[in-house]
Amino acid sequence: YGIETDIHCTKDSKIVCFHDFNLKAKFKINKFLKNIKYQDLLKISKDKKKPIPLLNDLIKLSKNKRFLMLEIKPLFTKENLKALLKEVKNLKNYSLTSFNEKNIINLHKIKKKLNLGLLIPSTFTFNRVIEKSKKKHVKFLVLEKKFLREKKLHKIKKKIYFYAIRDKKLFNQFNNKNLIFENL
């Protein structure tokens, strides 16, 4: 199995692995990651004994032995995208994904040969999924699990992953698919 993580930039442009845009749910502090410096974030996470690693820490830990799927949560500036590419330059097996297609477009403009995936929410129609799959900057799709039962998946000529599988029964039923799962 590989590792999927969400990434954000702090106020001082450090790339961190964290799911939420805000610290409220995990730390009961109403601050957005983009508005806080990494040293302040580090202090909060250490005080609460809930570490927030830098992307670079995850990369070192993975030692190029695990596939890393890195989801860019907010819209990154072009400077932050370039910094991200610098951090992943020595990785052999990774992909960059986002719900925000502008991140994928901008990454593709910077470097054409990246493994870029577009995340597709459950609100999309299947026709819209097909349309997005034809974009040259999209190398693969990450579809919400509702699309697992879609009969016309074969029409998509790119690799497909499915998120977020939290149910063992569903995992076992579709384990021949590319599933992104959590807490199983």
Map each language-model feature to its residues.
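C-terminal active-site rim and adjoining tail of enzyme catalytic domains
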Residues: H8, K43-I52, G117-L184
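A residue-level structural signature of the nucleotidyltransferase/glycosyltransferase Rossmann-like core
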Residues: G2, I15, L33, S95-L96, ...
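Metal-dependent phosphodiesterase/phospholipase catalytic core, i.e.
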Residues: H19-T123, K136-K139, L143-K146
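Short acidic, gly/pro-rich beta-turn/loop elements at beta-sheet edges
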Residues: I15, N80, N106, R128, ...
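Short amphipathic alpha-helical segments
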Residues: V16, H108-K109, L153-H154
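Sequence-level detector for tyrosine residue identity
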Residues: Y1, Y38, Y94, Y161-Y163
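Glycine-rich, proline-tolerant flexible connector loops at the mouths of alpha/beta enzymes
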Residues: E4-L23
